[in-house]
């Protein structure tokens, strides 16, 4: 170090230039003693009795003075070069130590303060949690006291204590119901007591998850693709034929395969088309067939034609929807039937199957309406249906036997007796090629697997539906093969919707104690399952919206 800087440093230290340090008159022990003696010779001023705070401050000041004295003594023993180097590297040691002590004291105080605040906060939370939660808002109508008539309800009569309680307010009725519940349960159960359970770590985690759920407004759970069993969510829509009311029996109800249109026909000789919107269902047009009470009407597979038959005629009417022409087919070459009533259209639109008398089934070309071939069973035909791929025909006889035919060869592939059936009435095949349902006169519906019907001579049904007590005259699978509709025209309200594959009946249809369906004659589902329609003997085509299916 240069001599000038060294001498300047020593001079500044001794002159008291360093802040926060008392000036020293010189080096060595003699000046220090002189300084102390000079302090003793100063006259003492009269002071009041020291308080606890002033005593603590005086003790700290004395401690600081002793540290300074020891530090100065040590610094005097160090070489000047070492003292200068420490000052350059560490700064003023005295200031740094004082600042460090001050920071330590302040941090300790903040730590105690924060702990105290946290304890106060926890106590406040405990007190707040014990308080009863108040409602977010209060409805003025709820505050008005409403009187409940106790005598008009048999359940409320049981909780009346005397005749004077024929009318009670809502609050008193609520208290009375609570008392009855507690009496039946033997006290208040744990789940009914607010705050009775202590929160565990799992409860805290679930609460955190709930908080996370409340941070978003999107959908967390997507709609299930499969239809749940038990309750079928549905809405009663305006009748399909509301704009053309009639009192004649409805014989056929069918949805158009490609357009949002429903067809309604009946014994009043009319075929009507309606636009399906679920609200007004406006009429598109009506076709009147003179002296032709319609037994059955059906769309072609492509939806371009409507076929209709009557109860006492061998004429088959074909209505061309594109051209707007009505074409009667008076005679089919090779067909010797006196009447043409029951018929089926193949799903691929290639064939037309007509059920005749004496057990004959006649297969016609849908395009030319010419006879291709005939098939015969033992006994009379009760009902027939095509498989979903149009390669097989299922014929159900009145004797309870089921015949499986190959369409191309028109040969019988298999034949079996419907289990427990003495007289067959209806048959239907599912759209996915999995099930065959047979409805008998006893009201039993047997559901079979189609593979077992082809391979076994005595197949066992998957499930026997026994919810009806009269003959099952109508069967219909929905497009997704999740619902099987069964109905009987022999009894009012005799309709059930069966869930598949559980084979359980939906409990909410039909609505209990509401005679709105009457005697159901025909049923159908819309192409994608969004609507369900049925016609009754009173001339009403009732329609329901199935909420599980978003499309028509």
From Swiss-Prot:
Record cross-link Glycyl lysine isopeptide (Lys-Gly) (interchain with G-Cter in SUMO2), residues: 78, 178, 197, 513
GO cellular component terms attached to this protein's record: nuclear membrane; nucleolus; nucleoplasm; small-subunit processome
Modified residues (Phosphoserine): 114-115, 118, 201-202, 206
Each WD repeat, start to end: 245-284, 289-329, 376-415, 417-458, 467-508, 515-551
Principal location: nucleus
UniProt keyword Ubl conjugation present: yes
Coiled-coil region list: none
Residue positions, PTM Phosphothreonine: 200, 217
Compositionally biased spans, kind Basic and acidic residues: 72-81
Localization (cell): Nucleus, Nucleolus
Keywords: Isopeptide bond, Nucleus, Phosphoprotein, Repeat, rRNA processing, Ubl conjugation, WD repeat
PANTHER family (UniProt xref): U3 SMALL NUCLEOLAR RNA-ASSOCIATED PROTEIN 18 HOMOLOG, WD-REPEAT PROTEIN-RELATED
Entry protein name: U3 small nucleolar RNA-associated protein 18 homolog
Annotated source species: Mus musculus
Gene: Utp18
